[in-house]
Amino acid sequence: MATSKSGGSSKNGRDSISKRLGVKRSGGQFVRAGEIIVRQRGTKFHKGKNSGLGRDYTIFALKDGIVEFKTYRGRKYINII
């Protein structure tokens, strides 16, 4: 009786969907109040003047203005000036 062994199962073949994180507005760019500047996991960037921090660590503009990235004592801050 001719038999055929069953094929082995693969442990690969999965991937998660991308989360679209990162900087959405560059330094020197004009933004309106409420616009998202950075989407991040944790505080890679910290909120500065006229910027807010969402519960998922998203940084957004509180007022209309120009985006400014500043480093102070090893931390990156985002200001709207």
From Swiss-Prot:
Polar residues compositional bias, start-end: 1-11
Domain of life: Bacteria
GO molecular function: structural constituent of ribosome
Pfam families per UniProt: Ribosomal_L27
Family per record: Belongs to the bacterial ribosomal protein bL27 family.
InterPro entries, per the entry: Ribosomal_bL27, Ribosomal_bL27_CS
Keywords noted in UniProt: Ribonucleoprotein, Ribosomal protein
Signal peptide: none
Biological processes per GO annotation: translation
Protein name: Large ribosomal subunit protein bL27
Region feature Disordered, mapped onto this chain: 1-21
UniProt xrefs under NCBIfam families: L27 (TIGR00062)
GO-annotated cellular components: cytosolic large ribosomal subunit
SUPFAM superfamilies tied to this protein: Ribosomal L27 protein-like
Name of the gene encoding the protein in the UniProt record: rpmA
